[in-house]
Structure formats: C-alpha cells, structure tokens
Amino acid sequence: MKRLLFLLLFALAPAAFAATPPVALFYMTSNPNSIRDFFAHSSQIDLLVPTWYSVDQNGLVTGEPEPAVLSRAQEEKIPVMPIVALFNKKAFHQLATSAEAQARMNEALVRACRLHGYTGFQFDLENVDYLDRDNLSALVKTTADALHAAGLQLSIATVPNAPGYPGADGFAKWIYTDWRGAYDLAALAKSADLICLMTYDQNTRWTTPGPVAGWQWTLDNMNYALQFVPKEKLSLGIPLYGYHWYTGAPIVTPATIPDAAPTEKPNPTADYISYPDAMQLAHDWDGKLQWDADDRSAWFYFYRDQEREWVFFTDLHTFQDRYQLAQQNGLEGFCSWVLGEEDPAIWNFLPRHGQASAGR
C-alpha cells in the first residue's frame, strides 16, 4: 500500500509542478483606469512595474511614485519595480557612452529604491540603434552591478528579435536596425535578473491588419529567447490591448515643381484600443466577434462608410493560451501591458498572488 501511494505521488509530482502559476507581472501607467485596476486586483498581482521614471542623455532620472499605489503595494507585500525609460536614439547613445552620466543615473536609481522601498528598477530602453548593441549590453551590466551591490535587482524589457537578423524587405530592415537589433539577449541575461520579452506589437499602425501577438510569432520569439536566456529569467509578454485598423484620408504632398500635380498616397492606419473600447465598437457597428484558430487571437471586422475596418484584440481566450504557454515551458512568469486595458474576465482566471512559483 505504501509503495502504491509513493508511486502515485511520484506520478503526480510533474503535473503538480507544471501547474505552478507563473509570476504575474503587470505594468501600470498614470492613467486613472490603470491605477483603479491595480487597486481592484492587487491581490492577483505578483510584481508591479509602474511607468514612473525616465532618464535623459545626461543620466538625470526624473519621476516619483503614486503615494496611494505605493502604500497599497507595501501593505500587500507586492514588490514594486518601476520602469526607467528612454526612447530616443541620440539620447541613448550619449548616455551609453558617458561613464559620468551612467554613474549619475545609477546613484539616483539606488537612492530612489532606498527612499521608497522598491525591489529594483526595470529598464525600458527602446528605439535604440542596432549599432549601439554592445553599448546597451555594457550599460545594463554597469547598472546591474550598481544595483546588485546595494542588494537590489534590475530587469529589462526587450523587443522580441527572432530570428536575430533582418529580413529581405524594407520594413524588415527598418524594424531590425531601429528596434530589434540592439538586444543581445545572451549578454543581457548575464547581467539582468529578469528579461521581460515584449511579445506584442507584431502588427501595429506600421503594418497591415493582424494579431497583436500571433501564436507562431509568439512561439518563434519565445523559443529564440530561450536559446540565450535561462527560463527562470524569462517573462513572456502578454498584451492586454488591441489595434483598430481603418482607412485614413489620403496624404497629399504639394508639388515642388510649378504646374505639377500634387503627390497623393494612401493612408491606412491603426489606433491603439482597449478591450472595453473594442467591445463598444463591435456593439455599435454590429461587428461579429471571431477567433483565429491559427494565430489564437480574437478579432472582428465591420463596415463604416462602405469600407471594412478591422480590430484585433486580447480576450480571455487569447490571454489564457499565452499564460499556459509560459506555464508549460516553466518560464519565470508573464508580463502584461497594461492594467486598465484588459478583458475583465482574466481576473476570474488568475490566482491570487503568493501562489506563483517565485518566492515572495
């Protein structure tokens, strides 16, 4: 009987381990909807990453916490790891090539952590030129060393960059040189405590209509990242929002030659849209909600002014599939942009914090 019980427990152990909830990291902005969402669902958030800080080319860190948010997080023992952001190519290059500016930044980050009780900071450094790849890795190491010396942590949000090289067309080259090519995942993983892989924005205003994070695209980028990043350091990005594509007014450029006709170009465009706003749009225009089984994404279309408009968005089903992907692959967790934009049904699915795999 004892032997049978032992064998049964042994057989169930892998399933129990696989079922361990991934760490739930949520981003929060200063938008009132985002803040209200945090207060409503703080018991299901394992790590809060608010967009409170930025840094400039001189290493000047600016920002401050939302007092009520910080107080609630401390009451519930939710680690707070604010973003420190920089999205400017030239400014980043100046910061990354100045030891003085980096020292100023790192001193400010450590000071803010000690003053407010943060567990550390998360770098959100985007629009970085691919030629600054080594500079980015070196900057992250310098900051990680400074924070680690103070008993703090550093994470970094990275643009997904599979397959690791540019494609053939002009857009593929641009997205690599201006967005994807700067992130050396192997080097970053050696320095940072956590890599938040931003597996979203596959399709945006720059592209034709499509899922925010298609299934195969998400798999490709996760598997590529796992070649360089230990799974216990990787958090999978899950978007909570969508995009609404429609036809904009043609762009008319006046002729530079006398008597010549102006140049006209088409202007398809897309707007960022939250789940509640997407549902309102579907209701108002009789959009038929659909499920893309290949991309595992929710979407719909409708007609306005005799033209078709598309919306791809994240519903509970879309969220669950990606959550389970992180769980089944034993990743550290998932990171979702952004509180206040989501399908409220996800809160009926997510466990309370403290049940995730990481110690609290």
Annotate each PLM feature:
Residues 58, 129-278:
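Substrate-binding surface in catalytic domains of secreted glycosidases
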Residues 28-42, 97-114, 176-188, 313-327:
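Short, acidic/polar
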Residues 4-13:
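Sec-dependent N-terminal signal peptides
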Residues 19-108:
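Glycan-recognition patch characteristic of GH18 chitinases/ENGases
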Residues 48, 123, 195, 236, ...:
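Conserved, mostly hydrophobic/aromatic
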Residues 27, 52, 82-86, 125-127, ...:
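A cross-domain feature marking catalytic cores of carbohydrate-active enzymes
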Residues 240-324, 346, 354-359:
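Glycan-binding loop/region signatures in secreted carbohydrate-active enzymes
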Residues 318-336, 341-342:
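Conserved, well-ordered alpha-helix/loop/beta-strand core segments that scaffold catalytic motifs
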